[in-house]
């Protein structure tokens, strides 16, 4: 589980952080609660945040990751929508409103969520859940930026022979 920082901020830093929460945005596909179906936490209830965009174009991929006008938020009360792009502050508020259901993790997925590493660096500290990051593992420099904020990394490495793409690493 992710440690909670108890450092105090100066009023100037608090103001700058609030401004960043409004100005830092990302396009979101959907937010939903479901049972994790892969990896070491299979069978646990996770809250899923699916972000737009991917740096790969795997021939077999069926995941919607194109930008959409609205992000779908699926709850027990039905579906609501957020206008894209969504700010870190608004998204944190939506995610933290799911606290009425006991989730083990916030699973951040895509597409490729590390395309939004700067956004995630601001968002994750505002979330009241440990983070399970699903990634294709190709954006390792971006991962360095947020690795200390993430509890679990699930890297789904794609082999060139299965994707039809060129090798990612030498």
Where are the language model's segments positioned?
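Short, flexible, glycine/charge-rich loop motifs used to bind or transfer phosphoryl groups or to couple energy/partner
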Residues: 37-38, 94-97, 141-144
């Amino acid at each position: 589980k992710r440690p909670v920082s108890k450092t105090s901020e100066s009023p100037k830093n608090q103001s700058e952080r609030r401004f960043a929460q409004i100005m830092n945005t990302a396009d979101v596909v959907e937010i939903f609660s479901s049972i994790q179906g892969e990896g070491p936490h299979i069978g646990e209830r996770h809250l899923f945040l699916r972000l737009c965009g991917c740096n790969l174009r795997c021939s077999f991929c069926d995941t919607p990751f194109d930008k959409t006008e609205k992000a779908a938020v699926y709850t027990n009360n039905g579906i609501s929508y957020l206008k894209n792009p969504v700010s870190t502050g608004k998204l944190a508020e939506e995610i933290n409103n799911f606290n009425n259901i006991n989730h083990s993790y916030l699973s951040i997925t895509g597409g490729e969520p590390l395309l939004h590493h700067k956004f995630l660096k601001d968002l994750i500290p505002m979330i009241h859940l440990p983070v399970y990051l699903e990634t294709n593992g190709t954006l390792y420099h971006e991962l360095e930026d947020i690795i200390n904020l993430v509890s679990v990394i699930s890297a789904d490495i794609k082999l060139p022979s299965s994707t039809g793409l060129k090798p990612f690493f030498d």
